[in-house]
Amino acid sequence: MYAVVKSGGKQYRVRQGDELLVERLAGEVGDRVELPVSLRAEEGVLDLEPRTARAEILEHLRGEKLKVYKYKPKKGYRRKKGHRQALTRIRVVEV
């Protein structure tokens, strides 16, 4: 059985026991969170009823650094900026 859950404006296909990285979730390590399920499938039968999946927060971390660089030619205008996305690693406990 698998389900499609929503988190941080994205959708993820998960099974029970899966670990995944999602955008930062509120809560402490060890807390359980509920994620809305948009689709659930079991043995080829689709279930579209609104449900929730439960997941456990394993750790909070930051993604790899992205460098953004912009410039205007012939004018000496240069800007460099970095960004690291805040992420949370979760384990799906129940679908």
From Swiss-Prot:
GO MF annotation terms: rRNA binding; structural constituent of ribosome
The keyword DNA repair belongs to this UniProt entry's keyword annotation: no
Per UniProt, which keywords does this protein have?
Ribonucleoprotein, Ribosomal protein, RNA-binding, rRNA-binding
Cited PROSITE patterns: RIBOSOMAL_L21
Gene Ontology annotations of biological process type: translation
> Listed GO cellular component terms?
cytoplasm; ribonucleoprotein complex; ribosome
Any idea what job this protein has? This protein binds to 23S rRNA in the presence of protein L20.
- Oligomer and partners: Part of the 50S ribosomal subunit. Contacts protein L20.
Which PANTHER family does the record match to this protein? Answer: 50S RIBOSOMAL PROTEIN L21, LARGE RIBOSOMAL SUBUNIT PROTEIN BL21M
Query: What NCBIfam families does this protein map onto?
Result: L21
Tell me the protein family, please. Answer: Belongs to the bacterial ribosomal protein bL21 family.
Protein name per Swiss-Prot or TrEMBL: Large ribosomal subunit protein bL21
Species assigned in the record: Rubrobacter xylanophilus (strain DSM 9941 / JCM 11954 / NBRC 16129 / PRD-1)
Origin organism lineage: Bacteria, Bacillati, Actinomycetota, Rubrobacteria, Rubrobacterales
